Amino acid sequence: MKVVVDTSIIIDHLRGVPQAVKLLKEIEEGSLEGLISTITLMEIMAAPKMSKERLSAVKELLGIFEHCPVDNQTAITAGSLLAKYRRSHGLEPMDALIAATARVNEAVLFTLNTRHFKYIEGLIAVNPYDAEV
């Protein structure tokens, strides 16, 4: 199964949260195909005052994912989502790009913030800590 992993889960892994550690181990072992959006990559790298050792560990961790850049199709999809959901549901541009990444790649979105995404048609957003993956 292809899954786009949201920032919150990566942060949990770095903090040693058991569910996140288990999930990323499944990706590393190939049980799940892990994708990461450019937005998540940016959010992770924006952590303040990261030591060289921590930065090295983060880069190694991010290496288990297939990186999904924001290409034209993703940008167009995100724009359509914003047009449809920004006013009615408060969809933020970064969340629109993450949702678009999942939709364009026909992947499930793994996030701890399902409320940010549950209303988007054609997107499956799951809290992997609550679900049997």
Place the predicted regions along the sequence by residue.
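Acidic active-site catalytic centers that drive phospho-/nucleotidyl reactions
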Residues: D6, D12, E43, D95, ...
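Short, well-structured N-terminal submotif of metal-dependent ribonuclease cores
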Residues: M1-I36, A46-E60, E132-V133
